[in-house]
UniProtKB/Swiss-Prot annotation:
Matching Pfam families: RNase_PH (PF01138), RNase_PH_C (PF03725)
Species of the source: Methylobacillus flagellatus (strain ATCC 51484 / DSM 6875 / VKM B-1610 / KT)
EC number(s) stated in the UniProt entry for this protein: 2.7.7.56
Classification via Gene3D superfamilies: GHMP Kinase, N-terminal domain
Alphabetical UniProt keywords: Nucleotidyltransferase, RNA-binding, rRNA processing, Transferase, tRNA processing, tRNA-binding
Designated gene of the protein: rph
InterPro entries membership: ExoRNase_PH_dom1 (IPR001247), ExoRNase_PH_dom2 (IPR015847), ExoRNase_PH_dom2_sf (IPR036345), PNPase/RNase_PH_dom_sf (IPR027408), Ribosomal_Su5_D2-typ_SF (IPR020568), RNase_PH (IPR050080), RNase_PH_bac-type (IPR002381), RNase_PH_CS (IPR018336)
Protein's recorded name: Ribonuclease PH
Enzyme class of the recorded protein, top EC level: transferase
Amino acid sequence: MRPSNRAPDQLREVEIIRHYTKHAEGSVLVKFGDTHVLCTASVEDKVPPFLRGRNQGWTTAEYGMLPRSTGSRMDREAARGKQSGRTQEIQRLIGRSLRAVIDLGKLGERTIHLDCDVIQADGGTRTASITGAYVALHDAVGFMLANDMIQESPLRDAVAAISVGVYQGTPVLDLDYIEDSACDTDMNVVMTGSGGFVEIQGTAEGEPFQRAAMNRMLELAESGIRTLLLKQKEALGL
């Protein structure tokens, strides 16, 4: 039995709220149960030095957690003077996931920054960030089209992500913090709307997992991501 009484293949309640802030070209509050992440997309008319003069854009991401997004307060990374390895890993994952579905050549020399700030954490913050950031990116692209900054959408596909794992011997979908902290296996899966895998990150935390368990986790992830892709479409009115 899962602590939340969910079935093994059951997502937490997912909510995607668009236009959550007024300044960013795209902004979304995404909720996976008690995990809440604010995702904003900001358009900037310049690119990193390595892309200057190539008439190509860039999409990148930053990730952070508010000091009291968890059970006990933690210092801001800015106050500590450096980002943790975990933060760097997560924001690179978010950036890779979004770049997998955007044609950077259609952006011109512009950068879209995705900022994902965890307001409240209860497991699955990186996968919630990817799922919400895509919707914010979609809205930023809509802003660019409406303001004649670009002539056609650079988005090639949708992208969403979910966690899966083995908890008390059973493969389960969308782990919350209690499950994540006690699971035998933890895996994050990122997929596109057309069914392609962008990334699979899986680690045995306790007992090594067998091929059958891995196959079942991937089946659960695919099913969960299909639901998330539909949630994204509903939020975007597509």
